[in-house]
Amino acid sequence: MKQIWQALKAHQQAVEHRGILDLFTDPRRAETFSTRLGDMLFDWSKTNIDHTARDLLIDLAGAAGVAEKREAMFSGEKINETEGRAVLHTALRNMDRPVQVDGVDVTPALRETHARMQAFVRDLRSGRFTGQGGPITDVVNIGIGGSDLGPAMACLALAPYADGPRCHFVSNVDGAHIHDTLQDLDPATTLVIVASKTFTTIETMTNAETAKRWMATRVSDPAAQFAAVSTAADRTAAFGIDASRVFGFEDWVGGRYSMWGPIGLALMIAIGPEAFDAFLAGGAEMDRHFREAPFAENLPVLLALVGLWHNQICGHATRAVLPYDQRLARLPAYLQQLEMESNGKRVAMDGHELTHHSGPIVWGEPGTNGQHAFYQLIHQGSRIVPCEFLVAREGHEPDLAHQHLLLVSNCLAQSEALLRGRSVEEARAVLAKKGLTGSELERQARHRVFPGNRPSTVLAYEKLTPATLGRIVALYEHRVFVEGVILGINSYDQWGVELGKELALALQPMLEGRAGTEGKDGSTAQLVAYLRS
C-alpha cells in the first residue's frame, strides 16, 4: 500500500496546477467519470482525478483489502475489533438473507421485531391504540446522537409521505428543547418514544423524566403513553413501560447506523410500514450494488475514493455536503455524525497512531441558502473546499415546478462556477460594460476574479422517495466503511465521546455547590465559580 500512496502523491503533485476544465477536452470525460445505479447518477468528472489517479485509487482499495473486509462485514464477522462486535446494520434491511453471529442466524429475531413494530404502528395509525384523551396526534422521540439524527433527518426528508401523527424530536439536555417541543402538544394524545439502548443515557433519561412529569399533568397513567427502544428490559419496566411497547436491537447495530430498525420507529409511525419497507428496500439495493459491482463501477467505493483523494492526497481538510433539496436540510448534520464519529480517529486498528490524517470535517447546508452565506469562501477563499451536491430531477410540488427548475439551475450553476471560475480578463469585460475604466476598473476586477478549478461532485436522482433516501443513506454508510478500511481505522467505535461524559458527572456537584474545585485547572475553576447555581 505504501507504494500506491506514494504514487498517488507523486501524481497529484505533477498535476495539481492542471485545470480540471482541461480534462474535458476528452469528449467522453463526463461519461467516463460518472456512475449510475437505477435512476441515480453520480458525476465525479469535475475533479482533478484522471485515468491514472483513478486506477491508482482502485488499486489502493484492492491492496487495503476492501473486498475481503466487505464480505467479513456482511458475513457477521467481528470487524469492530475494539469492542469485539460484528457490524450488521445491513441485516436490518436484508432480513430475508440468513446471517450468523456466533453461530446463530440473527434474521428470525430481526423479522420478529420488525413485525412487532409494524403491528404497533398499524394499531396506532388506525386508532386501535389511543392516548388517554383520544387517538394519538403527536409522537415525541427522545434520544440523542444516533437515536435522533437519523430518524429526524429521514422524517423531514420524507415529509410528503408523512400521513401519520406528527413527529417531533428532542435530543438536547438543555431544558429549552423539550419545553419548546411540548408546550403546544396535548399530553392526552401524545406518544413519547424513549430511544436509548441502555436506558441510561443521561440526556435522554433526563428528558424522559421531564416528559413523564408533563404527561402526568393530564393523564392518570403517564407510562401507558410511552414506548421504548432499548435492550434494558428491567429499566424500561421500572419506568413503567409495558413490554409490548419495548423494541430492542443488538449490540452489533451501532447507534449511528441504527435507523433501519427500532430506532426508526418514529419514522415508521410518520410514513407507515409500507413506505418504511420501501426505505429498507432502497438500502438493500445499495447493499447489493456495493457487494456485486466492480470497484470501477461501484458507487460507494468511488465516492470513498474521491473523498480520500481530496482529503489524503490533496490535503483538503473539509468537505461540504450541499443538498439542493430543502427536505434534506438535516442530511449534513446526519453525515457529520456518520462520518466524523466513525472516521475521526487518531489511532489505527493496530493500536498505533496514524501516520496520516483521519477523516475530514463534514459540514453543509441546503441550497440555495448556502449561496447567500458561505459560498463566498468556497468560490474565492484561500482554501479549497471540495463540494458534494445532491439534487433531484423532480420535486413533490407539481404546481411549483418552475421553482424546482430554478433550484436545479442554481445547483448546476454552482458546480460549473467552481469548475470554470472567472478570469481577470472576463472580469474586466464585465466591468467595462458597466462603464468602469482605468485604475478603478483594474482595482475592481481583482475582486471579481474567481479562481475556479475547485472540485465538486453531483449526486442526481429522480425524486426523493423512501427508496431513494434508503439508497442515499446506505451509499454514505458504505463510503464510511471503505474510507475506514483504507485508512486502517475502526469506523464502528466512538471512544472520543466518553471523556467529556465522565468530566461532566464530576462537575455537576461542583456547579451545585456541593463540592469544591480542587484539582481543576484555573480556567475551569473560574467558570464553575461564575456559573455555579
Swiss-Prot record:
Pathway: Carbohydrate biosynthesis; gluconeogenesis; Carbohydrate degradation; glycolysis; D-glyceraldehyde 3-phosphate and glycerone phosphate from D-glucose: step 2/4
Top-level enzyme category: isomerase
Compartment(s) where it occurs, according to its Swiss-Prot or TrEMBL record: Cytoplasm
An annotated Gene Ontology molecular function: carbohydrate derivative binding
GO terms of biological process kind: gluconeogenesis; glucose 6-phosphate metabolic process; glycolytic process
CC terms in the record's Gene Ontology section: cytosol
Pfam families: PGI
EC number, as in UniProt: 5.3.1.9
Recorded superkingdom: Bacteria
Residues the record marks as active site: 341 (proton donor), 372, 501
InterPro entries in the record: G6P_Isomerase (IPR001672), G6P_Isomerase_C (IPR023096), Phosphoglucose_isomerase_CS (IPR018189), SIS_dom_sf (IPR046348), SIS_PGI_1 (IPR035476), SIS_PGI_2 (IPR035482)
Catalytic activity: alpha-D-glucose 6-phosphate = beta-D-fructose 6-phosphate
UniProt keywords, alphabetically: Cytoplasm, Gluconeogenesis, Glycolysis, Isomerase
Purpose: Catalyzes the reversible isomerization of glucose-6-phosphate to fructose-6-phosphate.
Family: Belongs to the GPI family.
Name used for this protein in its record: Glucose-6-phosphate isomerase
Species of provenance: Cereibacter sphaeroides (strain ATCC 17029 / ATH 2.4.9) (Rhodobacter sphaeroides)
Lineage: Bacteria, Pseudomonadati, Pseudomonadota, Alphaproteobacteria, Rhodobacterales
The encoding gene: pgi
